[in-house]
């Protein structure tokens, strides 16, 4: 089973870290619970919360020697925002990803932009890695609402990291149900969807839950 590496910048607050890590744990538990209760040979994946790591006895400025190196290498100095495509490319090319493939999920405080220069809240390489940011969420006056939105954003990118929805099953890469896998490209929509899903008492819809379980099995047996 592929492990899940969690990283975040030092500027992420303690309450944000707690929501981030606990939400990943909950999402993976939901996925694992879709597997047969008896006779399953698939263990739950190990979740490794590394935070802002630095390799022991290494110069932090050396290639792949620290989480900060990834950030510095992907930072757009003109806009002071992170180039997400560049960041994820570095993650996928790291030496230990080649030796022991695993999932990567990163939470940062700075603004993000994609390859077309568009401002975004997160980006994923489906089935491999994802990055998300609290930058937009911190514009909210209500801290509780910001944490609820962070929970929803984290659940969405855990699903993306696992490559859910499965397009071959549904013919689309976007979920249409009341579900955290619905894309929310604006802060207003993210808040609206978060509140709607809370009121409905749901996170992942039934189909997305099933597909997350399938993805865990696939990663365990090398089909991811």
Where are these regions (language model features)?
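Propeptide-to-catalytic entry region of secreted or membrane-anchored zinc metalloproteases
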Residues: 1-114
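A structure-centric signal for secondary-structure junctions around beta-strands
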Residues: 1-3, 101, 126, 175-178
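Residue-level recognition of short, structured coil/turn motifs
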Residues: 29, 33-37, 146, 163, ...
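Low-complexity, polar-biased intrinsically disordered regions enriched in Pro/Ser/Thr/Gly
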Residues: 61-66, 119, 169-170
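Glycine-rich, flexible loop segments associated with nucleotide phosphate handling
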Residues: 78-81, 146-150, 175-178
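Active-site-proximal segment of zinc-dependent metalloprotease catalytic domains
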Residues: 93-166
